[in-house]
Amino acid sequence: MLACNYLMCTVLAASFAGAVPLPREGVAFTVGLGLVSGAMYLGGFLLLQWNIARNGVVLSATFMKLGVLVPTAMAMLIFGERPGAVQMAGMLLAFLAILLINLERGSQKAASRAGLVLLLLVGGSTDATAKIFEELGQAPLKDTFLLITFVTALLLCMAVCIARRQSLTGADLLFGLLIGAPNYFSSRFLLLSLNDVPAVIAYPTYSVGTIVLIALLGVWLFHE
């Protein structure tokens, strides 16, 4: 299913990237960052799977969402963003909401704290590549950056599936393709938003918005 998800993301990214002429400047940086981002996309998911098996869904989901601390801190410490009082209050409320929404589902002890911390760092670093590109990359290459990211994730995911000898079912294909569209557009809109919205606001809002959307889909589709 994950490979089908990345396949849909790749197709959508190619459709946007193919419509824009590419500047020569910044191509090497875009490709390099895209390769790193794609590898981290898949690595973060595999790490999430491992943590769910060791630490349970609640703690794993919480630390994955708290990964927004990484790009938020990076924006302040490296790129010099300084949130105002209202923005700082909004950030704190967003992080509090993440904790409350996830930890409300139950409490359990971590079997591997190091695994949870690594999940937070990898997930947050993956999201941070969008801010790095926004600061250091060429804006006309943003769709190329996403294309390289998802092509890399797709190829690596296919390699993992082959190594594990996993078969593809009709359900995997259907749900993977359905998940791929919102996955791609959420990444694209995050990248676009960073042009106009400070990262210290964009990332916490993006994370909380994802949680709310998943919750609404759970109510609508599964009557949770």
Task: Tell me what each language-model feature is.
Residues 1-224:
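Polytopic alpha-helical membrane proteins, predominantly small-molecule transporters/carriers
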